Structure formats: C-alpha cells, structure tokens
Amino acid sequence: MTVVTMKQLLEAGVHFGHQTRRWDPKMAPYIFTQRNGIYIIDLQKTIKMLDDAYNYVKAVAQDGGVFLFVGTKKQAQDAVKEEATRAGQYYVNQRWLGGTLTNWTTIQSRVKRLKELKQMSEDGTFDVLPKKEVALLTKEMEKLERFLGGIEDMPRIPDVMFVVDPKKEKIAVHEANILGIPVVAMVDTNTDPDPIDVVIPANDDAIRAIRLISGAMADAIIEGKQGQDDSEDVEKEMADKAAAEDDEEESIEVVVEKSED
C-alpha cells in the first residue's frame, strides 16, 4: 500500500518543479516532462521514493531513533513545527545556527541558558528584578526560544534529519554529512540530490506539498514508535513467561528433592 495516492500528490502540487532555466541536471532522472517553461516531476518515482523514505524512517523510529525536522523558509515553518511536534520529535524552523550539529556542546550551553531564563520567568525571579533588566532578559529568552526552542529537549544529536529544501538548508545538510547523519529530504528540480541519502522528488515551495510530505514522515515515526512499544511489550511478556517457567522448574526440583528425602 502506498503512503500517499497519486491524487493527493496532484492536489498538493507536488509535481510542479522550477522553471526550466533554473534546474540541476542531476535531477533529470526524476523529471517527467516540461510544460510552459516549468519542469514536471515524475510522480510515479515520487510515490516509490516516498514509500522507501517512509519505511526507512519507520524502521529507525522503531529502534528508538531521534529525528530533527528542518525547514526555515516561510512556507515550511508551520508544517515543520507542527509535524515534528505531533511525532514527538524536534525541529528548526527559523534560522539555522551554524554549528547546531557540529558544535553541539556550545549549542547545549545556549539551550541550558534558555532553560535558566524560562525558570527565572516562571519562579518569580523576574518579579523582583528591575524592569530594565527584566526587559533585556526577556528579549534574550525570546531570541533563544525562537532559534533553539525546537531542539530544547533533544537528548542527543539526531539519528536522522528530514529537510524541506536542502538547497536553502545547505549548511544544515553539510553538518549532517560531516557527522554521518542520514538526510531525508524533499528535493526540487533546482537542487543537487547528491548530498541527500534518501531523496523524495517534490515541489518544496508549495505549502500543501510540504505539509503532505512532512505529515507522511511524522506518520512514519509515529507508526515506528508504536511498533517499538509493541515489541517492548512482547519482550516483556516473553521475559515474564521465561521467569515464570524458571520459577516453575525450581518448584518442581524442590518437590522432587523432598520426595527423594
């Protein structure tokens, strides 16, 4: 069963690429035709590659993987935040701060500062400070929240990064490549697909297209996590059963020993 239907892809405008004069030749295998100076993406390939991406993401989620959604362009900001949050994962939907992954220790110190400021705001510390100081601290907190709020609780460097428009997010993609973090991405006709590990050929400018693909990735994570929970339940049942059998064997041995006495 396919993750999304051809009808859904068409209605969301996933097939519309960029103008033919703005293209990357490496995307040629994913282009169906051109119409009125616009490349049309081959949706048969999109369906197949989206299915592959879904299964890959689901498998990583089932192993307890951590995911980072990245999309800072205006069209992507809401979908990236909402779908990452729905899947219980993390996101960057404002400016990507250089070193977010490659300088994780420094970023963690800024996250710690954000948490400190939030605590001060909540525990009444701001109420006893001068108004001017509170204004400065509030401004600092809001700035940190804007850029780091989506990764505030991320426990470690992600296992997989999902990207909307890797051409725009080239710094994020480069950092992931350096660290060997697999990148799953919506790749439009104007983008080099080589730095991407799992390519989803798609219009990365249309809000509906972004929401559809981001939603599919969130669904994959949720399904994978459900599978993880199920497997943990099975493992627990098997462990409990094994323990019960051990207890039963011990009881039998005791009975046998007593009968021999």
UniProtKB/Swiss-Prot annotation:
Q: Name one GO molecular function term.
A: structural constituent of ribosome
Does the entry feature the keyword Magnesium, yes or no? no
User: Sorted alphabetically, which InterPro entries does this protein's record hold?
Assistant: Ribosomal_uS2, Ribosomal_uS2_bac/mit/plastid, Ribosomal_uS2_CS, Ribosomal_uS2_flav_dom_sf
Any one cellular component term from GO for this entry? cytosolic small ribosomal subunit
User: Which controlled-vocabulary keywords does the entry list?
Assistant: Ribonucleoprotein, Ribosomal protein
Domain of life of the source: Bacteria
Any keyword Translocase? no
Q: Where is this region: Disordered?
A: 223-261
User: One GO biological process from the UniProt record?
Assistant: translation
Recorded hits in PANTHER family, A to Z, give: 30S RIBOSOMAL PROTEIN S2 PROKARYOTIC AND ORGANELLAR, SMALL RIBOSOMAL SUBUNIT PROTEIN US2M
What family, per the record?
Answer: Belongs to the universal ribosomal protein uS2 family.
Q: What is this protein called?
A: Small ribosomal subunit protein uS2
State the species of origin: Lactobacillus johnsonii (strain CNCM I-12250 / La1 / NCC 533)
